[in-house]
Amino acid sequence: MLAWRPGRPDGCRAAGGRRYNPGHDCIKASVSLNSAARNAPAGSQPVKAELWKRVYSRVGSYWKGLVLAVLLMAGAAATQPTLAVIMKPLLDDGFSGAKPHYVWFLPLAVVGLILLRGICNFFSDYLLAWVANNVLRGIRGEMFERLLGLPDADFKRGDTGRLLNRFTIDAGNVTGYATDVITVLVRETLVVIALIGVLLYMSWALTLIILVMLPVSVGIARAFTRRLRRINRETVNMNAELTRVVSEGIDGQRVIKLFDGYDAERRRFDFVNSRLRRFAMRSATADAALTPLTQVCISVAVGAVIAVALSQANSGALTVGSFASFMAALAQIFDPIKRLTNLAGKMQKMLVAAESVFTLVDQTPEADAGTRALPEPVRGKVEFRAVSHRFPDADRDTVSAVSFLVEPGQTVALVGRSGSGKTTLVNMLPRFVLPDGGDILFDDVPIQDLTLRSLRSHLSLVSQDVVLFDDTIAANVGYGAGGTVDDARVRDALAAANLLEFVDGLPLGIHTPVGQNAARLSGGQRQRLAIARALIKNAPVLILDEATSALDNESERQVQASLERLMRGRTTLVIAHRLSTVQNADRIIVLDAGKIVEHGPHSELLAANGLYASLYNMQFRED
C-alpha cells in the first residue's frame, strides 16, 4: 500500500490489447516523455542564467577557499611565460659563453619555476576539491531533504533509476564540472593573458597573426555548444533508463528465472544500451571534431608566423634566441586555448546536470498547512464523513461518499474486491492521499488542521510489503521511537512479536544486521519484526494492510498471534484479503466500487447473505 515500487512508466500499456513488448514500448515511452519534459525549458537564456546563478551561489559560499585557490592559480600562471622567456638568454648568451654564470643560474631558475608551479597547482587543486565536495554534500543534502518531503503520489509516479542517477551522477557532475570550469577559466585564461603579453613584448607583428585566428576558434567552439548540450541531455536520460532496467533485473531476478524472461530482459537492456552507445558516440564525435578543427586554425597561424619570422631574421631584426623564445611561448599557448575551447562541453554538461538536480529540489513538497497538535491524552477515535476521492484521469470515484466511525480501541476491517477503494481509503488517514470531498477526524479534530508530524506520530503501520532498513534488528525495531531505545525494550517487543527466540539464536542477537531488503529474514520474520517496531512506537491507532496475505499457514499463525497482542487497546483499521483473519473484528465494512454496501459483525454479514458472504464462501471453497 504505502511502499514505493519501481516499475515501468505510467501509461505503458500496449494499445488495443497488443502484447506489451518490454524491449520497446515502455522504454520508448519513458525516453520520449523524459526528453520532452527536459528539452522544453533548456534552451532559453533566462533558464541557463538562473542555473548558473544557483550553482555558483552555492560555490560562492566557500569564497575564502576560492579566493586562495585563484591566487595560487595566478602564481602558477605567472611561471608559464617565464620558462619561455628564459630561452632567449639561454640561446643568445648561454651557449656563446658570454655569461658564464648562466651555467648554474639558468638550470636552477628552470627547476625553481617548475617547483613553484607544482606547489601552486597542488594547493589550488586541493582547495577546489575541498570546495567541490562541500558543495556536493550540501546539494545532496538539499535533494534528500526534498525527497523525504515529497508527496506519496510522486513516489508512485517516479522512476527509481532517474532518482538514483540524480544523487549519484548528476549531483557529482554539477560540482565537478563547476569547479572544473573555474579551474580552466581562471588558470588557463591567466596563462593565455600572460603568454599573449610576452608575445606582444617580443614581437607585436607576429602576435597579431595569432590573435586574428582566435575569433575563428571561438566561433567553431560556439557552433558545437548547442549540439553538445542536446546530446548530453539525452545521454543523461538514457543513463537513467539503463539504471532502471538493471535495477529491475536485480530486483526481479527470481521472476525472470521462473518465467524464462531472459530474452525479454536482454531485449530491454540491449535496446537501452545501444541507444546509450549511439548518444555517447555522437558526443565523442562532436568532442573529437572540435579539437582538430581548432588546431587547424592555429596551425595556419603558426605557418604564417614562421614565414614572417624568417623574413625578419634575414633582415637582422630577429635573433635565433628571440625566435625560439617566441615559439616556446606560442607552443605553450595552444594547450590552454584548447582547454578553453573544450570548456563549452563541460559547461553544457554542468547545466544539464544542474537542470536535473534542481528539478528535484524545486518539486513541491507535501502540503502541511496544519497548525494544531492532537490534544492529550490521545484516545484514537477516527471518523470518516462523506469522504470521496477520484484519481486523475479516472472515469469514476475511487471512494464515493464513505462515512463510518471507529471508536477508541475498536477494530474495523475493510474488505471488498480488488479495486474497491480499501487501500485508498486507509491511505487518507495519514494523508498519503488527500480526499476530494468530505472530512476525516482524529479525536474530533479534522486531520487537515493537524501538523503531519503530530498526525503521523500517533499512527503505526504493518503492511504486506514490509520495509526494513539495512541495519541491525535493534535499530529496525527502535526505528521511529523518537530516541535511543534500550535493549530491554527491544527484547520485550520482540518477545511480544514471537520473534525473541529466533533472535537469541543468532550470533549477534538483537545486534545482528538484517541485510539489504532484510534478505536474511523469512517473510514471517520480517512481518513480526515490523510488529515489534509498531509495539515500540506504541501509537494509539494501528493500520494493518493485508499483513498476513503473503504468508504460509504456519507463518500466518505466528504473525496473527503477534498481531492480536499488538491490537489490544488500540484503534485498528484492517485491510484484509483473507477474510478468516477478520472474523473477530468489532465491525466489518464491505466496499464495492468505492461505496459501502454492507457493514456489521462477521456473523450478521454471513446471515445477510450479501457480498461479504459471497466473498467468504468463495475463499472457503478455495481453501
From Swiss-Prot:
Residues 382-618 form the ABC transporter domain. Keywords: ATP-binding, Cell inner membrane, Cell membrane, Lipid transport, Membrane, Nucleotide-binding, Translocase, Transmembrane, Transmembrane helix, Transport. It is an enzyme of class 7 (translocase). Residues 67-349 form the ABC transmembrane type-1 domain. Signal peptide: none annotated. It catalyses: ATP + H2O + lipid A-core oligosaccharideSide 1 = ADP + phosphate + lipid A-core oligosaccharideSide 2. Its main location: membrane. The chain crosses the membrane at residues 66-86, 103-123, 190-210, 290-310, 317-337. PROSITE patterns: ABC_TM1F (PS50929), ABC_TRANSPORTER_1 (PS00211), ABC_TRANSPORTER_2 (PS50893), MSBA (PS51239). ATP binds at G416, R417, S418, G419, S420, G421, K422, T423. GO terms for molecular function: ABC-type oligopeptide transporter activity; ATP binding; ATP hydrolysis activity; ATPase-coupled lipid transmembrane transporter activity. Belongs to the ABC transporter superfamily. Lipid exporter (TC 3.A.1.106) family. Homodimer. This is ATP-dependent lipid A-core flippase. It comes from Bordetella parapertussis (strain 12822 / ATCC BAA-587 / NCTC 13253). The lineage of its organism: Bacteria, Pseudomonadati, Pseudomonadota, Betaproteobacteria, Burkholderiales.
